[in-house]
Amino acid sequence: MPASDQGTLTGRYTLVPRVLIFVTRAQNVLLIRGAPHKRLWANLYNGIGGHVERGEDVLSAGRRELLEETGLSAELRLCGVITIDAGPEAGIGLYVLRGERPQGELIASSEGTPEWVAQASLAGLPLVEDLPILLPRLLQMQPGDPPFSGHTSYDAHGRMHIRFSSP
């Protein structure tokens, strides 16, 4: 099928693809504390991630973002997909990845400082708003579990609502 038959008509709702990566090591998870100068999530802990660039698949984007933001490489697997309703014309397609068996030395980047955090300490950290919902779901997953599917929306007061589909 040629590209012209893919149905990407103007005026349709579109998704911007992004990856969000959580690398685990024993009972620790790698998070990045946002740099103080960041417009979004300054000084808050988040997963590693960013945009999928043209020509990349999701796992390649995850590997690139992980290396750029932390200096590490890891074995990645898809754990979930969340559509985020960010506006009337464009949303975000968020591919949630889990990394295991990390290799390399941690480095800071312009995005922030990566830190290994004990899973038991997560509740006491200043986390990005959706992490208290996403992390428990991701961390309980076992190899071979099907990826989860979710949708994030915002109400008239700007409050985030996340719902997950049943398998």
Show the residue positions of the predicted features.
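Conserved N-terminal beta-strand and adjoining loop/helix that marks the start
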Residues: 2-30, 51
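Short, well-ordered beta-strand micro-motif
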Residues: 23, 96-100, 116
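Conserved Nudix-box catalytic region and its N-terminal flanking loop in Nudix hydrolases
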Residues: 28-68, 160-167
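A short coil-to-beta-strand element that immediately follows conserved catalytic motifs
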Residues: 71-81, 148
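Short, solvent-exposed loop/turn elements at beta->coil junctions and helix N-caps
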Residues: 9, 79-86
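C-terminal regulatory/oligomerization modules of transcriptional regulators
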Residues: 143-167
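Active-site-adjacent beta-strand/loop module that shapes the phosphate/pyrophosphate-binding cleft
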Residues: 84-106, 128-142
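NUDIX/MutT-family hydrolases
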Residues: 107-138, 158-167
